């Protein structure tokens, strides 16, 4: 079905519902546009409107939209179909890179060689044997190591074991580099190297739309620079860059000097108090984190006059912060009240909140207490919930701060931030009385 035959009512409705900052982004008179979209500002809505508008104005152009998860790809495809748009290539970064590799392999007559699972584990066995002797460690489970290096960085393991896996992963990456080998996680790197060897550019599309720009790593970014198109539209939020362990670069926005910059200004997810608190946490801790001043976003902000002032602006929302000293600060309707911590906790738990944790280990421990609405922060990225409990974790680096910001911006109506040990103890007593 062509766009001319599509359901243009849905398209027009999306365009009509754009706010002023979203409209400036969608209709920007520039070939290259980059959008800074804070949490809850309508990022997906804006991106879809931009894709639809470009399709409307360029009926025969080849359009590619890149996301970073299969779930996001599926959602975008569904929402485009609702507007009658069926001919936009919506793909993930790894699938896009693989498809281009196949195109260049056919063009230059070379064979794509990627390690399979058996070959990867054989290499890992060799690396582990050497490492065990040097590090004087008894054993490492190859299956766990394989799972770790292929993407599951939040599995339920001890900190010491995680450090061991990280060290082994670094050796595996170096082994691949030294032997010119690739596995399926390396498609973007493989593509870039091929483009360098053959001095290739991507000339197969007319417009490139990229979601979650903050999750792009330097190699992927350089690849996008070699895409020759009449339109590039990138959107994301540097404060939500939580995949540093994969090489993502939240500072990528600063590298787009030749792009027209737009900023989405309005929040449609959370009460203002929640947004103010999340922003205050980020801005208060940013310099400390950069200066390697380890901190907790509960204890540092709970006593902050700046935080209190910010949270008192706006009406209707509620933010509760539980400190390690069991003092509860509640900001509601512009007024601050001090309430008993456990009574406030009980009130929030009766709302069946989503509990967000930093690690799978924390998730598992809470689930074992009989609570099912619990998730890691990484799994909750891009989602929203009426009520949220955020389990506080130590912030050691900028990635930790970005993860904290993602967690603090998932709530629409109410949010509680609490130390994990305190919360676990409360859940045990709470379970006994319900």
Where are the regions a protein language model picked out?
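P-loop NTPase Walker
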Residues: 1-107, 355, 409
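Conserved interdomain hinge at the start of the Helicase C-terminal
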Residues: 310, 332-350
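Catalytic phosphate/metal-binding cores of nucleic-acid and nucleotide-processing enzymes, i.e., regions
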Residues: 121, 129-140, 144, 161-164, ...
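Structural preference for long, well-ordered alpha-helical segments in enzyme cores
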Residues: 47-51, 72, 76-80, 172, ...
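Conserved two-lobed SF2 helicase motor
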Residues: 89-95, 183-191, 370-378
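Conserved helicase motor core of SF1/SF2 NTP-dependent helicases
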Residues: 41, 70, 207, 214-323, ...
